[in-house]
C-alpha cells in the first residue's frame, strides 16, 4: 500500500478497490468532498486495484495490525462515515472505511 494515493470516484459516487472477491473497499466520495480530512498519523490509502490484508472486518483488530489491515483515505479526502470499531482509535471509529 502507498501513502497519499488518490481514490477516484466512479459514476455512482462510490469507489471500490479490490484484488480479491473476498475483500473490498468502499468509500463514499460525495461525502468525502464535504468533510475535512482527519489528521492522524500512519494512515494507509488503497488505490484502485489494491486491497487491505485479508481478514474479518467484524472482529476487533490488534493494534499492531490496524495500520496495515485497514485502508485510509488520501490526505485530501475524509473517510466515509461507516462505523468500524478499532481497538486503538475508537474516537474516530465512525471515520474508518468499511471492509466487507
Swiss-Prot record:
Name of the protein in its database record: Putative protein p52
Residue numbers spanned by region Disordered: 81-100
The encoding gene: 52
Highest taxon of the lineage: Viruses
Biased composition (Basic and acidic residues): 91-100
